[in-house]
């Protein structure tokens, strides 16, 4: 369906056309008419499907710009998502004259208060900062007509449930509420029951939770071999833009440093970075000044960056929903992408949990060899030399070196000179700088009937799952080769001893339901 068939005003349609959009995405096509009718909506769709426009366009349509009041509130999980949503809402509402402000932690609250006083029709913010402003009476909610919860599952995972409930309780009851989430855990459903009026459900089928445009692979690799395995794959694939996910802030810092040592243009983002640096890194990544962005799950929430071709899960995510969000960074706007997850041998059971959620089976991928990496880097160097020789600006400087060049040509053969140039351009695989990445414990192995080991049907933790993988691998190119033989008693005994020596606190209900055990820093 085209946007001009959705009963939107001429002002909005003009801005939509300027942005180059013609066809509405499925979530937009189904949500916009319901929202324009004033109905509450719960929308479930993967990231990158146009959720901001799905709630933003009908919200902008209802704004009365002649009234200097805050009429809509958008709650977002992270600073980055708040800024991006504010920018998109401002872009679409520009012709209509809608004022949109964003508020978030890590920036001066005084400046944000001043901006709110200067006028706003829509406010986009993170839960903590919104509550601060409400308590200071700098954010007045009495005229709110539309409340939007964006990436609701992420706000839940980040522990914002109480803050969200506190904010909702202060918004007028006769409001319209729009809730969007990539996944729909029970706590999110309870919000719908408690705070929404007969909401309409718009849902992307589970089989589409991860887009078909993303080829999903995994590599079974030991912890100490992950970094070299990943960088060789990058050498071979030569991704235009890649995001690498690490589980901790320390991991992000170490990976960023290591990638720079190996010659990649890389920067990292995590919660400890100040806001100015985070925005600078993201701007450089969007503009192509960086090849690789390294991030924690929290720091990457809601990133809307076009052109990401590869996602590397250096650490397997701690919950399956995070996997959906991670790979949603690629395969956007009709373009294909690739995700590669590195899995320690005793983390194999976690893949089935992810697959149960995404309804898509990951393919085993064979690691690239040292020689394949070296050959790829040489090809890149040769192409760069060819491009430079075709550049008239570069060739104009050649004559400055004419006398010295002729002297070298008299002493050495063209082949020797070419080999020397390549040796300066391409890192020798035998002399690559060493990179140390601190080892972290793999996710805890937890045998059960849900794919974490034992004898779960089709589970990856048991022998049958591996045998199926071996059969799938044959004839399918670069697939992972599994060791043959028993994975039974010896492994079970080791896991039994591991569990005995690493007793965990009692599991919460959500941990029992998902199978994932998340502990605070310092817990064994």
Curated annotation (Swiss-Prot):
CDD domains: DEADc, SF2_C_DEAD. It is found in: Cytoplasm; Cell membrane. One of its GO terms (biological process) is RNA catabolic process. The keyword NAD does not apply. It is a peripheral membrane protein. SUPFAM superfamilies: P-loop containing nucleoside triphosphate hydrolases. Residues 32-202 form the Helicase ATP-binding domain. It is an enzyme of class 3 (hydrolase). It comes from the Bacteria. A motif (Q motif) lies at residues 1-29. ATP binds at residues 45-52. Coiled coil: none annotated. A motif (DEAD box) lies at residues 150-153. One of its GO terms (molecular function) is RNA helicase activity. Its EC number is 3.6.4.13. InterPro entries: DEAD/DEAH_box_helicase_dom (IPR011545), DEAD_box_RNA_helicases (IPR050547), DEAD_helicase_CshA (IPR030880), Helicase_ATP-bd (IPR014001), Helicase_C-like (IPR001650), P-loop_NTPase (IPR027417), RNA-helicase_DEAD-box_CS (IPR000629), RNA_helicase_DEAD_Q_motif (IPR014014). The keyword Transmembrane helix does not apply. Oligomerizes, may be a member of the RNA degradosome. HAMAP family: DEAD_helicase_CshA. PANTHER family: DEAD-BOX ATP-DEPENDENT RNA HELICASE 47, MITOCHONDRIAL, DEAD-BOX ATP-DEPENDENT RNA HELICASE CSHA. DEAD-box RNA helicase possibly involved in RNA degradation. Unwinds dsRNA in both 5'- and 3'-directions, has RNA-dependent ATPase activity. Belongs to the DEAD box helicase family. CshA subfamily. This is DEAD-box ATP-dependent RNA helicase CshA.
